[in-house]
């Protein structure tokens, strides 16, 4: 068996929720992490030979403020970030449908998680209650309004149709 199966059934990563509020641990994890970079259309900016993940050091030596911790797999940290944060232009992108046919299940699940989170972050820049500017917290898993204090969280469970 090739290791490939139905995409999105593998949960992908241990999301390690307690670590998201510990910047020093996030910074330490970044040094050996891998990052998934998505363009403004939600496509993955592949690293090389259709590899899903960039070495974090190629993206930035220090953890970028907009790097979202996706979780861990086999003690390896995985982060997501938008392509506009990069200092280089990605040469190739890959959509989620194409990735589902090329990548192992867990990588496709991580792609779906990254795409959903970065989309939510882009849509949550302003408070839904008062319109004030919201700041991302918890390594990208919550947004807090600077004006009224409303805290919102993404819905990260998969949809089944």
PLM feature spans:
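Acidic/polar active-site rim loop that often engages polyanionic ligands
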Residues: 105-109
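N-terminal alpha-helical interaction blocks
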Residues: 1-104
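Cys/His-rich short segments
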Residues: 112-160
């Amino acid at each position: 068996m090739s290791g490939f199966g139905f995409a999105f059934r593998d949960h992908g990563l241990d999301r390690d929720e307690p670590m998201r509020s510990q910047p020093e641990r996030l910074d330490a994890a970044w040094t050996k992490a891998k990052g998934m970079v998505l363009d403004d259309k939600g496509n993955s900016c592949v690293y090389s030979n259709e590899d899903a993940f960039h070495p974090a050091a190629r993206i930035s030596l220090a953890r970028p403020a907009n790097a979202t911790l996706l979780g861990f797999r086999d003690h390896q940290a995985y982060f997501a970030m938008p392509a506009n944060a990069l200092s280089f232009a990605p040469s190739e992108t890959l959509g989620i449908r194409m990735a589902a046919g090329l990548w192992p299940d867990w990588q496709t699940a991580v792609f779906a998680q990254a795409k959903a989170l970065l989309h939510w972050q882009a849509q949550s820049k302003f408070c839904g209650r008062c319109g004030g500017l919201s700041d991302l917290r918890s390594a990208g898993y919550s947004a807090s309004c600077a004006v009224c204090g409303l805290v919102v969280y993404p819905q990260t469970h998969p949809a089944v149709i």
